[in-house]
C-alpha cells in the first residue's frame, strides 16, 4: 500500500561487524542501504527526482534497483513511471518494479542498448521527464545525503568505499565530502569485467565500453560513466579499485557469514575492494557502503554456499 504522505529516505544503517573487521585486519564500518526503501541506496536519488520535477510522467533505463526506486517514488507522488530494463535482469527486480506500479519495457541488450530504447520512448512521450539513474544533478544531490548522514555520526573515517557503475553514488559522496571540508578519501569499487570508470581514470577522459559486460554485479553493467558524474569524480575521487568476480562473490559470502548482512553482488563491491587491496587498508578506519540487498534468491543461495 502506498502511504498517503510521501516517505523520505530512511537513514542509513550503520553496522559494526567485529568478526569481519578482525578477519580483514581493518577497522570496518558498514553503511548498509539494504534496509532502505526498495532495498537499495537508489531510493535516495529517486525520491529527490520525483519530488522536484514538475512532469507527471518519469521514464528511465535501469538494471533494476533504480527502476524499483523510481517506481516507488513516482507512486508516492502520484506520477506515471516507465522503466526500460534488460531482458536478462533478475526476475525479482523486474517483478518488483511492476509491483511498485511502473510499466516495464524489456529490451534485448545484445541487439539494442537500454539507452537506445529509452530514446525511442522519449520521442513517443515528449512531455515525460527522462531520468538517468546516475547522470542527473538531482540524482547526485539525493545520493549526497548518505555522506552527510555519516558525517553527522562523527565516525572519524579514513576512507569511504562505494560501488561505481555510472557514478551517481560516488559523485554524490565526493560532492558531500568536498562541501564538508573533511579529509576523507572516497574510493570507487568497480567490477574488473565492467571497468569503464577505471579505464577513464587511466586515460584522463571518459572511456566507453563496446558492450555491456556479464559481470555478476548487474548494477554495475554500464557502458560509461556519466558526464555530470565525471565532472565531479575526475578531480575528487581518489581511485577506482577493480574487483574480480571471485572477490565480489567472496564479499557477498563474508557479509553473510561475518556481518549477518544480505548484500547483492553490486552491494558487496566495496568489501571486494578491501579484498583486492588488503595491505592498503590494514588498521585503517574504512566505511564500506553496502549499496543494496536485492539479490536473486537462487543466485544468493549459491554465493553464500560458495558454489
PLM features per residue range, with description:
Residues 1-307:
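PLP-dependent amino-acid enzyme catalytic core
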Amino acid at each position: 500500500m502506498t502511504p498517503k504522505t510521501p516517505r523520505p529516505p530512511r537513514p542509513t544503517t550503520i553496522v559494526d561487524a567485529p568478526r569481519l573487521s578482525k578477519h580483514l585486519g581493518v577497522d570496518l564500518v558498514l553503511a548498509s542501504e539494504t534496509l532502505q526503501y526498495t532495498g537499495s541506496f537508489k531510493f535516495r536519488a529517486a525520491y529527490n527526482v520525483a519530488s522536484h520535477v514538475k512532469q507527471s510522467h518519469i521514464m528511465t533505463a535501469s538494471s533494476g534497483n533504480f527502476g524499483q526506486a523510481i517506481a516507488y517514488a513516482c507512486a508516492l507522488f502520484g506520477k506515471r513511471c516507465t522503466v526500460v530494463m534488460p531482458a536478462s535482469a533478475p526476475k525479482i527486480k523486474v517483478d518488483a518494479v511492476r509491483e511498485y506500479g511502473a510499466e516495464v519495457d524489456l529490451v534485448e541488450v545484445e541487439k539494442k542498448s537500454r539507452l537506445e530504447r529509452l530514446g525511442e520512448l522519449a520521442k513517443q512521450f515528449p512531455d515525460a521527464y527522462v531520468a538517468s539513474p546516475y547522470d542527473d544533478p538531482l540524482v547526485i544531490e539525493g545520493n549526497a545525503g548518505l555522506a552527510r548522514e555519516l558525517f553527522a555520526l562523527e565516525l572519524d573515517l579514513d576512507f569511504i568505499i562505494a560501488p561505481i557503475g555510472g557514478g551517481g553514488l560516488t559523485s554524490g559522496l565526493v560532492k558531500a565530502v568536498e562541501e564538508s571540508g573533511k579529509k576523507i578519501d572516497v574510493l570507487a569499487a568497480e567490477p574488473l569485467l565492467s571497468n569503464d570508470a577505471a579505464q577513464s581514470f587511466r586515460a584522463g577522459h571518459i572511456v566507453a565500453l563496446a558492450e555491456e559486460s556479464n559481470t555478476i554485479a548487474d548494477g554495475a553493467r554500464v557502458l560509461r560513466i556519466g558526464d555530470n558524474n565525471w565532472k565531479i569524480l575526475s578531480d575528487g575521487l581518489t581511485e577506482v579499485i577493480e574487483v574480480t568476480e571471485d572477490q565480489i562473490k567472496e564479499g557477498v559470502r563474508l557479509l553473510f557469514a561475518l556481518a549477518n548482512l544480505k548484500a547483492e553482488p553490486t552491494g558487496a563491491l566495496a568489501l571486494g575492494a578491501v579484498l583486492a587491496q588488503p595491505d592498503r587498508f590494514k588498521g585503517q578506519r574504512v566505511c564500506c557502503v553496502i549499496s543494496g540487498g536485492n539479490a536473486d534468491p537462487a543466485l544468493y543461495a549459491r554465493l553464500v554456499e560458495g558454489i
